[in-house]
Amino acid sequence: MLDNLKDAVRKFLGSSNYDKAVNDFIKELQISLIKSDVNVKLVSNLTQKIKDRLEKEKPPTAIERREWFISIVYDELSKLFGGDINPEVMPKKIPYVIMLVGVQGSGKTTTAGKLALFYKKKGYKVGLVAADVYRPAAYDQLVQIGKQINVPVYGEPNNTDAVGIAKRGVEKFLSEKYDIIIVDTAGRHGYGEEVKLLEEMKNMYSEIKPDEVILVIDASIGQKAYDLASRFHQASPIGSIIVTKMDGTAKGGGALSAVAATGAAIKFIGTGEKLDELEVFNPRRFVSRILGMGDIESIIEKIKGMEEYEQIQKKMEEVMSGKAKLTLRDIYKQLTALRKMGPLNKILQMLPGFGVFSQIPEEQLKLGEEKIKKFLVIMNSMTYKELDNPSIIDKSRIRRIAKGSGTSPEEVKELLKQYQVTNNLLKMVKRRKGLAKLFEDRNSK
């Protein structure tokens, strides 16, 4: 699903003609999304948003246009699949009753086992209730899964009263002080019969009063997931969704985007047949993967570094104007931000006013990078008080910092000297600005 987008990103980043590469990438993106059964209108809206942002926004200083474009694509694709919504997967209270619903063939019973294993690994005492009385093999399947993961299963194989079974199963596990109880309900209706499914869900809900209802959707239905997820979301405000079989279909993108469009929360995705192949769904992590995780993470890290650097520059301006004081914590933030932005030689070439440093020999730049690493290690061994007020760092503190950072006292002193030099330079700039303003005031009189 959407696998070709990784190659499209690499091709785009290595292209020489920027404008042509942008148009080619957008076409490739549209084709990939439509092939993944994402609604055409959603695809059209997505590409328009990308184009609008390209026109209205400018890349941060030191960020190449290509990288900025990919970061916009990453951002808008993440929104398509749910944005910054991080589902709460841990129970809000103990005991916690979960009711699973879904149409036949959605993988609901297997998902019940996967959920049980997920919570068991987190240290919870979990019980399963087999309340699917319409599919003959459902009870046996859940019992088999329970044995595999060592989780008890309550069921009444000769009884067809699903609500009664669910109620008695929940009561049994509650009396035995179980933390999480997962109820597997009947999935006898096919897609297109959502009304009957939701009616059954309401009846079961009123009897067992679960803390959460989770709808299980098969990814292979693609954008058809919209109707089912929409009605479920309206009927059950406490509900969330698990999208299964993401590994076995090209339509996973369509299913995820359709569910996200309803506003319903996707909690997990099933990524394989094994019981441990259940993943907490994070839209940004998902998009990172389909675009090529390494490429995207390095670009986003660089942009974050630049944003942090620009914030630090504002602090420097405040220091020069006398509104703030420079601390070692500020130096630490500045060096950390610079490291996120890439190799020192590239950073110096891209930052405004630093082009002159592009002629610095490679060996000296490497030494500079090594020094930055060492300074960061030293500052990591300092207390918050020392970072915020370096004047308190005496000989005994220097020895302690050197020992903690695996450096020498001389190297700690070198950092403190560098800090003092920077402080003096900023004070000098401040004095010069003050003198310039004084002359301006006198000349204007």
From Swiss-Prot:
<dbReference type="InterPro" id="IPR036891">
    <property type="entry name" value="Signal_recog_part_SRP54_M_sf"/>
</dbReference>
<feature type="binding site">
    <location>
        <begin position="102"/>
        <end position="109"/>
    </location>
    <ligand>
        <name>GTP</name>
    </ligand>
</feature>
<comment type="function">
    <text>Involved in targeting and insertion of nascent membrane proteins into the cytoplasmic membrane. Binds to the hydrophobic signal sequence of the ribosome-nascent chain (RNC) as it emerges from the ribosomes. The SRP-RNC complex is then targeted to the cytoplasmic membrane where it interacts with the SRP receptor FtsY.</text>
</comment>
<dbReference type="Pfam" id="PF02881">
    <property type="entry name" value="SRP54_N"/>
</dbReference>
<keyword id="KW-0963">Cytoplasm</keyword>
<dbReference type="InterPro" id="IPR022941">
    <property type="entry name" value="SRP54"/>
</dbReference>
<dbReference type="InterPro" id="IPR036225">
    <property type="entry name" value="SRP/SRP_N"/>
</dbReference>
<dbReference type="InterPro" id="IPR042101">
    <property type="entry name" value="SRP54_N_sf"/>
</dbReference>
<dbReference type="InterPro" id="IPR000897">
    <property type="entry name" value="SRP54_GTPase_dom"/>
</dbReference>
<dbReference type="GO" id="GO:0005525">
    <property type="term" value="F:GTP binding"/>
</dbReference>
<feature type="binding site">
    <location>
        <begin position="184"/>
        <end position="188"/>
    </location>
    <ligand>
        <name>GTP</name>
    </ligand>
</feature>
<dbReference type="InterPro" id="IPR004125">
    <property type="entry name" value="Signal_recog_particle_SRP54_M"/>
</dbReference>
<keyword id="KW-0694">RNA-binding</keyword>
<dbReference type="Pfam" id="PF00448">
    <property type="entry name" value="SRP54"/>
</dbReference>
<dbReference type="GO" id="GO:0016887">
    <property type="term" value="F:ATP hydrolysis activity"/>
</dbReference>
<comment type="similarity">
    <text>Belongs to the GTP-binding SRP family. SRP54 subfamily.</text>
</comment>
<protein>
    <recommendedName>
        <fullName>Signal recognition particle 54 kDa protein</fullName>
        <ecNumber>3.6.5.4</ecNumber>
    </recommendedName>
</protein>
<dbReference type="InterPro" id="IPR027417">
    <property type="entry name" value="P-loop_NTPase"/>
</dbReference>
<dbReference type="GO" id="GO:0003924">
    <property type="term" value="F:GTPase activity"/>
</dbReference>
<keyword id="KW-0733">Signal recognition particle</keyword>
<keyword id="KW-0378">Hydrolase</keyword>
<feature type="binding site">
    <location>
        <begin position="244"/>
        <end position="247"/>
    </location>
    <ligand>
        <name>GTP</name>
    </ligand>
</feature>
<keyword id="KW-0547">Nucleotide-binding</keyword>
<keyword id="KW-0342">GTP-binding</keyword>
<dbReference type="InterPro" id="IPR013822">
    <property type="entry name" value="Signal_recog_particl_SRP54_hlx"/>
</dbReference>
<comment type="subunit">
    <text>Part of the signal recognition particle protein translocation system, which is composed of SRP and FtsY. Archaeal SRP consists of a 7S RNA molecule of 300 nucleotides and two protein subunits: SRP54 and SRP19.</text>
</comment>
<dbReference type="InterPro" id="IPR003593">
    <property type="entry name" value="AAA+_ATPase"/>
</dbReference>
<dbReference type="GO" id="GO:0008312">
    <property type="term" value="F:7S RNA binding"/>
</dbReference>
<dbReference type="GO" id="GO:0048500">
    <property type="term" value="C:signal recognition particle"/>
</dbReference>
<dbReference type="Pfam" id="PF02978">
    <property type="entry name" value="SRP_SPB"/>
</dbReference>
<keyword id="KW-0687">Ribonucleoprotein</keyword>
<dbReference type="GO" id="GO:0006614">
    <property type="term" value="P:SRP-dependent cotranslational protein targeting to membrane"/>
</dbReference>
